[in-house]
UniProtKB/Swiss-Prot annotation:
One of its GO terms (molecular function) is zinc ion binding. It holds the Pfam family Sgf11. The long N-terminal helix forms part of the 'assembly lobe' of the SAGA deubiquitination module. The keyword Transferase does not apply. This is SAGA-associated factor 11. It is found in: Nucleus. Belongs to the SGF11 family. Keywords: Activator, Chromatin regulator, Metal-binding, Nucleus, Transcription, Transcription regulation, Zinc, Zinc-finger. One of its GO terms (cellular component) is SAGA complex. It comes from the Eukaryota. Component of the 1.8 MDa SAGA transcription coactivator-HAT complex. SAGA is built of 5 distinct domains with specialized functions. Within the SAGA complex, SUS1, SGF11, SGF73 and UBP8 form an additional subcomplex of SAGA called the DUB module (deubiquitination module). Interacts directly with SGF73, SUS1 and UBP8. The keyword DNA-binding does not apply.
Length: 99
């Protein structure tokens, strides 16, 4: 018979592996139960759609570009496209009193 050397590292690795395995099994069991419940309650439920290109929303439809909306900047008084508002505010507010 060979005698195994029990060290703090081996014990801590065993405890960590047991904890991680238990956590993963718990998460998988909960998610599986939740999915089964959703399928039972809503049989026609579609899952969200993922399109890696980024041109479709979560429902699989084309994203609407709201480039026709303009917002009035109270700081500088300009009308700014809604698509560019965040970038404009960053520049506009960082200028501050330099006007």
């Amino acid at each position: 018979m060979t005698e195994e050397t029990i060290t703090i590292d081996s014990i801590s690795n065993g405890i960590l592996n047991n904890l991680l395995t238990t956590l993963i099994q718990d998460i998988v069991a909960r998610e599986t139960t939740q999915q089964q419940l959703l399928k039972t309650r809503y049989p026609d439920l579609r899952s969200y759609y993922f399109y890696p290109n980024g041109s479709l929303d979560i429902n699989g439809l084309q994203k609407q570009q709201e480039s026709s909306q303009y917002i009035h900047c109270e700081n500088c008084g300009r009308d700014v496209s809604a698509n560019r508002l965040a970038a404009h505010l960053q520049r506009c507010l960082s200028r501050g009193a330099r006007r």
